[in-house]
Regions:
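Aromatic- and glycine-rich peptidoglycan recognition patches
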Residues: 2-4, 10-12, 23-41, 46-49, ...
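Catalytic cysteine-centered active-site loop
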Residues: 42-97
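...with weaker cross-activation on analogous glycine-rich loops/strands in unrelated enzymes
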Residues: 74-135
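General helical secondary-structure elements
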Residues: 1-2, 81
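Structural signal for the C-terminal ends of transmembrane alpha-helices
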Residues: 19-21
Length: 152
């Protein structure tokens, strides 16, 4: 067996093995996260905030997240709090771009969720902010947040 074949076999075995370790992502889920994180950016500065909005003519926060996820075949609830109740919780250190950031009314991580955005990594997110604010790429401005995933 040539050295090139041995290295390829070892690398292939490692890649296959990682797909079955809990807490690691499959190629499919990583691909979804990357796509969702990239897709949501097209709305930044181009789409207004509309309370109850769930289309590119105007979004509210949970309308934006549900629209992005639905674009890739992932059906999630329509409201921020209902989305939070459906997602698996992660620490920011384990969250990936494309996961969601949930904002709570207080420091209790089980408290009601009032806002949601798409995590972009590096303590940043894309979210529908408020009337007049539209869709923005912004720093996560609160410590009362939980990160959530349905993909890994």
């Amino acid at each position: 067996m040539s050295m090139r074949h041995k290295v390829g076999t070892i690398a292939g075995t490692m890649a296959v093995s990682l797909a079955f370790i809990p807490g690691t992502a499959s190629a499919h889920s990583l691909s979804f996260n990357q796509k969702a994180a990239a897709y949501v950016k097209q709305f930044v500065g181009r789409v207004p905030y509309v309370y109850g909005g769930s289309s590119p003519s105007g979004f509210d926060c949970s309308g934006l997240t549900s629209y992005v996820y639905r674009h890739y075949g992932k059906s999630i609830p329509r409201t921020a709090d209902a989305q939070f109740r459906r997602f698996h919780r992660e620490s920011e250190g384990r969250a990936w771009g494309g996961d969601l950031v949930f904002f709570h009314v207080n420091s209790n991580p089980n408290s009601y969720v009032t806002h949601v955005g798409v995590y972009e990594g590096g303590h940043h997110m894309v979210a529908a902010t408020h009337p007049g604010g539209g869709i923005r790429w912004q720093t996560i401005y609160s410590s009362n947040v939980t990160f959530g995933t349905i993909t890994h």
